[in-house]
Amino acid sequence: MAGHSKWANIKHRKASQDAKRGKIFTKLIREITVAAKNGALPEDNPRLRAVIDKALTVNMKKDTIEKAIQRGAGGGDDSNFDELTYEGYGPGGVAVYVEVMTDNRNRTVAEVRHAFSKHGGNLGTDGSVAYLFSKTGVILFAPDVDEDAVMEAALEAGAQDVIANDDGSVEVQTSAEDFMAVKDALMAAGLTPESADVSMVPATMAPLDVENGEKVMKLIEMLEDLDDVQNVYSNADIPDEVLESMGG
């Protein structure tokens, strides 16, 4: 399960770095706007509720959240974003899966293709790597959590798996459909996660040497820096020394 630990760490590290740059706010506002098109009430719109929770976790003001909801629910031109995915291969043959929200498909595909090309990868066709991932709820707890308490509450609530990571953190995995119910049950048990999201989890990891590990990290960071990109997932098993040298 070491690969899962590294994968979770990469996602968490990037979330922290994005917050410092302010980019995560822009991405979350866009996600709230899109989610609100299916209903402005979080209690009736699980997707909206999930992204509001993420926004509150990074200390977004409620006024900012409310404005994004109103913009999406109002259906104006400034809320017309297409949700797309791009798939490709990075250095060492690793699979890369990119989720975007865009108001200009031509601009976005050009930027994504450029990022792959610049860092030794190539953009593939639809379906080329998606089969290597599964849509999974991932609820991550810090290393000081009571592992037994998490396991008991999670399994009772219908979680698929509870993983004790090498770094001491505990990862709860759920089906996408059960994600909010399991998260709510854990919160009700007094267990507050470090992060919680529905993600694309790789079935197996692809080990990399240091050189390719550095290239893949640069590719992922360039993709995540693009305004239209919401999430980047990879099955890359990055060497520890690369993670440490890049602030992991």
UniProtKB/Swiss-Prot annotation:
Q: Where in the cell is it found?
A: Cytoplasm
Transmembrane stretches, start-end: none
GO MF annotation terms: DNA binding
**GO CC terms:** cytosol
GO BP term, pick one? regulation of DNA-templated transcription
One protein family per Pfam: Transcrip_reg
What keywords are assigned to this protein? Cytoplasm, DNA-binding, Transcription, Transcription regulation
Grouped into one coarse class, the protein's main location is cytoplasm
- Similarity comment text for this entry: Belongs to the TACO1 family.
Q: What is this protein called?
A: Probable transcriptional regulatory protein HCH_04926
